[in-house]
Amino acid sequence: MARVTNHAAQRTKERLGISKRIADKNADKALQMGIKHSDTSGSLHRYISSLYWKQQAANNVRIYCDNVYIFHNDTLITVFPLPQKYRKTTSKIKKGRKS
């Protein structure tokens, strides 16, 4: 079960428009079903790597519903939207997983 920091709850409300209670459920889904760093390649992989190095406490970065979730173990630190240029790549990765 993912935990959500106060900062992450504030950011999910601000950036995604969802409440704290729903943010907990959303963080769980992102942790379980989100695209992992190891699933990516190319420029998306480099982008996720740069986020990993910028966030000192981060050790788990996931992409879920066109948003980037930064975790430390199972604690959500922050969330922000995925840049538009990477969204096609993530949809291809999702389709490849289902097959």
Where are these regions (language model features)?
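Ribonuclease/tRNase effector modules and their secretory precursors
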Residues: M1-S99
